[in-house]
Curated annotation (Swiss-Prot):
Enzyme class: ligase
PANTHER family to which the protein is assigned, alphabetical: DNA LIGASE, DNA LIGASE B
Enzyme Commission code(s) on record: 6.5.1.2
NCBIfam families referenced in this protein's UniProt entry, alphabetically: PRK08097.1
Origin superkingdom: Bacteria
Gene that this polypeptide is encoded by: ligB
Species in which this protein is naturally found: Yersinia pseudotuberculosis serotype IB (strain PB1/+)
Pfam families on file: DNA_ligase_aden, DNA_ligase_OB
Full protein name: DNA ligase B
Residues forming the catalytic site: K132
Reactions this protein catalyses: NAD(+) + (deoxyribonucleotide)n-3'-hydroxyl + 5'-phospho-(deoxyribonucleotide)m = (deoxyribonucleotide)n+m + AMP + beta-nicotinamide D-nucleotide
CDD domains registered for this protein in UniProt: LIGANc
Reported function: Catalyzes the formation of phosphodiester linkages between 5'-phosphoryl and 3'-hydroxyl groups in double-stranded DNA using NAD as a coenzyme and as the energy source for the reaction.
């Protein structure tokens, strides 16, 4: 084992291995008429073309590569649903340039996963892996050793002339001694970084920074911080060893330093993981695997070639498709909007629902079924909506329910009509960790009690017998007895927990009994530590509400701790 391989293995032992996240749900065809899916395909295809043109012509795009790639995958699915061929890899890059490349830029086809990598590598030999440097693709043209052209990639056939910027980029040799009479190189202009770790820092907008400096009319001081990574030498030496050695002699050291021979897909996996974690002088977004054998430059076209492939890192942003929109009423009478999405895996967690807050916020986001959103995991693994990246062309109108009559003191009972959602939310809170913490009792169980009309108010479950509980389909006698005993033990829960379970707006510990709490005046509450005038009013409104007092009276008859009548 050579020293370099040993270094890699040791590095991996002390580093986190890449977790492949962001898996899309199993691709299925949308339940749309043929006419609509044709419209949606056309709209998405046009948008992707606009973003692609911005990327290749201007060096930046309104969306990240992660988002672009995932939406391109979605386009492929939709096209396959209509029996259309996959044109995403062979489609020419949109846009025009003025200056002809001596050899076309081929671009890279992206491998989906390790299985695709293994399949592509099978039967190929003399393979090498390099970091996929995230920068601005260019052509360097030398005549007699002198740099005569620096061209942007453009559409792969023609690009912009940036030659006047070359003297300000010290990483580009202006003259190469003993160079071939005609030398054409293709590579990446990148922002020089100091120990950049892709896994920790991501892309940091490096490519757009370089593109902006190159497109300015006057030379930017930033050009002094630009490096170059040569990844193609059309019609150059036949072996990679000779190629990288000569490039180093000519003044392009990065190619030699970051090109490694690979024998199997496991070698590629190892280097990909290493470069994802390791401090590097540039931003990367994956690796490129290439074979030594290439066609002559005259055969290169502005479409992905078959002699090199990209395998990108797991996406930092994850796209989900909105399947449906649900409106829920919380225990305090506040409505929230929950997006149901096609299942997506982020890290080790499958995401199916995303709470986005109030109806007002939903309207501001302007989200409809079929839209594509980006998600991330916030604290405790809770999914968070980050952005809407694609809106379907045909938008179905959805009307939110009217919740004006609901508030913090409504729906302590199942009736009147319309109360069931808030009533159910109250029950879920009551049995949850913020209330009485009754193990194994959640929304599904309470929903069954409501459905079978076995409960009509927030504490009516205390009257249920084991036989009544067992009458619910799916609950046998043994489980019914266990639930009954849990309910009876709940009577001994501390008084403060019962207050919380009922919805008391508590911000301080309340250890007194119900009768004592009830007799406190507004001013007494307001002067207690941690309670101001506003919260004191909320507490008094809660304590004086007829429904709350009726619940307290019932709990007194059940001899619940803290609610017993005192002489």
């Amino acid at each position: 084992m050579n020293i370099l391989n040993l270094k890699i293995i040791m590095f991996l032992l002390i580093s986190n291995i890449i977790v492949v996240g962001g898996a899309w749900a199993t691709s299925t065809c949308p339940d749309w008429p043929a006419t609509r899916i044709a419209v949606e395909i056309n709209a998405l295809e046009q948008q992707l073309n606009k973003w692609s043109a911005a990327y290749h012509q201007q060096g930046h795009s309104p969306v990240t590569d992660d988002i672009y790639d995932q939406l391109q995958d979605k386009l492929r699915v939709w096209q396959s649903c209509r029996g259309l061929p996959d044109k995403t890899e062979s489609q020419p890059i949109p846009g025009k340039g003025q200056f002809l490349h001596p050899v076309a830029h081929t671009g890279l086809k992206k491998l989906k996963d390790e299985t695709a990598l293994t399949r592509w590598m099978a039967g190929r030999k003399n393979l090498w892996v390099q970091p996929k440097v995230d920068g601005v693709a260019v052509t360097l043209v030398y005549h007699g050793g002198k740099l005569v052209q620096l061209l942007s990639r453009g559409n792969g056939v023609k690009g912009q002339n940036w030659t006047e910027k070359a003297p300000f980029i010290s990483a580009i040799p202006q003259y190469i001694a003993n160079a071939p009479a005609l030398l054409t190189l293709q590579g990446e202009l990148f922002l020089l970084m100091d120990g950049h770790q892709q896994a920790k820092s991501g892309g940091v907008n490096a490519r757009s920074t370089v593109a902006g400096a190159l497109m300015r009319k006057s030379p930017s001081p930033l050009l002094a911080q630009v490096g170059v990574f040569i990844w193609a030498w059309p019609d150059g030496p036949t072996t990679m060893k000779e190629k990288v050695a000569l490039l180093q002699v000519m003044g392009f050291p990065f190619t030699a330093k970051y090109s490694e021979p690979v024998m199997s897909h496991l070698d590629v996996v190892q280097w990909r993981q290493f470069w994802f974690q390791a401090p590097l002088p540039f931003v990367t977004d994956g690796v490129v695997v290439r074979q030594e054998e290439e066609p002559a430059g005259r055969y290169w076209q502005a479409t992905p070639g078959q002699w090199s492939m990209a395998w990108k890192y797991p996406p930092l942003q994850h796209i989900a498709e909105v399947k449906d929109i649900h409106f829920t009423l919380g225990r305090t009478g506040k409505g929230t909007v929950v997006l149901e999405v096609l299942p997506i895996k982020i890290d080790d967690k499958w995401i199916r629902r995303v709470n986005i807050g109030s109806v007002t916020r939903w309207k501001q986001w302007d989200i409809a079924p079929g839209d594509h959103i980006t998600l991330a995991l916030a604290g405790h693994g809770i999914p968070r909506l980050d952005n809407v990246v694609w809106r379907v062309h045909q938008r179905n109108t959805i009307t939110a329910p009217n919740w004006d009559k609901f508030h913090q003191l409504s729906c302590f009972q199942r009736l009147p009509h319309g109360c069931e959602p808030q009533f159910l939310s109250r029950l879920i809170w009551l049995s949850g960790p913020g209330g009485l913490d009754i193990g194994g009792i959640g929304g599904g169980f309470w929903q069954k009690l409501i459905h079978h009309e076995l409960i009509n108010d927030l504490v009516g479950w205390l009257l249920l017998t084991p036989e009544q509980i067992a009458s619910i389909p799916g609950i046998g006698n043994a489980r019914a007895e266990k639930i009954y005993q849990q309910f009876q033990r709940a009577k001994q829960q501390p008084f403060s927990r019962w207050l919380l379970a009922l919805g008391f707006p508590q911000v301080v510990s309340v250890d007194a009994q119900w009768q004592v709490v009830l007799r406190r005046s507004l001013s007494e509450w307001a002067t207690m530590a941690g309670i101001g005038q506003m919260r004191a009013k909320q507490i008094k409104h809660f304590l004086d509400h007829p429904d709350v007092q009726a619940l307290a009276d019932f709990l007194s008859t059940q001899k619940v701790v803290g609610f017993e009548l005192t002489e």
